[in-house]
Amino acid sequence: MADNTYQPAKVWTWDKSGGGAFANINRPVSGPTHDKTLPVGKHPLQLYSLGTPNGQKVTIMLEELLALGVTGAEYDAWLIRIGEGDQFSSGFVDINPNSKIPALRDNSHNPPIRIFESGAILVYLADKFGHFLPQDLAKRTETLNWLFWLQGAAPFLGGGFGHFYHYAPVKIEYAINRFTMEAKRLLDVLDKQLAHHPYVAGEEYTIADMAIWPWFGNVVLGNVYDAAEFLDAGSYQNVQRWAKQVAERPAVKRGRIVNRTNGPLNEQLHERHDASDFENHTEDKRQS
């Protein structure tokens, strides 16, 4: 159950070989490791990302805006391969000093506006284009309640449960039990909310749904961590209903494959520069 021989040192030191699946990119300091200018495409919105749950939040939002006919939401999505350290380039760190995807630059302003942290990007795009974040104070506040709930919950589901259950080089019973308990508690919170509402924040589909679905929707649908059975995901019937409903939205189907580098080749679009890329440049087409 536990390695009782381990005793923490008085002062921690970095063991570069001890980070498991992410040992080559995890480090205790910030800042760039190399100089590299980021590519820039033809649209004002330049997204630098990877198709993880956090990355999917933003590409789903952008595709939803485009589905409404918001032409100003056209964007270039550039792939940041975090396993190769792209997030530590000088160009990326200029946008996000925290070296985490996604990062967005809006070149329609002079000087350009940088936006980092996925929740901040969702709010920025909602405010900029006037969609998916209600103007009514009570509804806006409820949407933000759930957006920030997700921002606090995701590290427990991903960095906690997902890491120790799926990625960690050794299975630690205490850690898996600790974070499974929290993951299931969070699923129960969400299930009870969705028992009374079609969408997370009420009657409307909002940025709260776009933020929460890539994490909790993907988990209960078995798309990440291979943990749906372990978590007894089928017992959360309201989350299941909502997750399947959101998954069927055309913009979600598009957004979830942008900058994706795993899974079926027809669900990987490494870069996105216009709508035709979904038909012409998925990896199954590129490799044929």
Give the positions of each predicted feature.
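Short, solvent-exposed turn/loop segments enriched in Gly/Ser/Thr/Pro and often Arg
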Residues: 81, 207, 259
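Acidic/histidine-enriched, glycine/proline-rich intrinsically disordered or flexible terminal extensions
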Residues: 21-23, 260-288
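GST-like fold's C-terminal all-alpha helical module
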Residues: 2-3, 134, 138, 145-250
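C-terminal anion-handling pockets and recognition modules
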Residues: 253-254
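Phosphate-coordinating loops and pocket residues in cytosolic domains that bind phosphorylated ligands
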Residues: 94, 248, 257-258
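GST-like domain detector, emphasizing the conserved glutathione-binding G-site
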Residues: 1-177, 181-184, 281-288
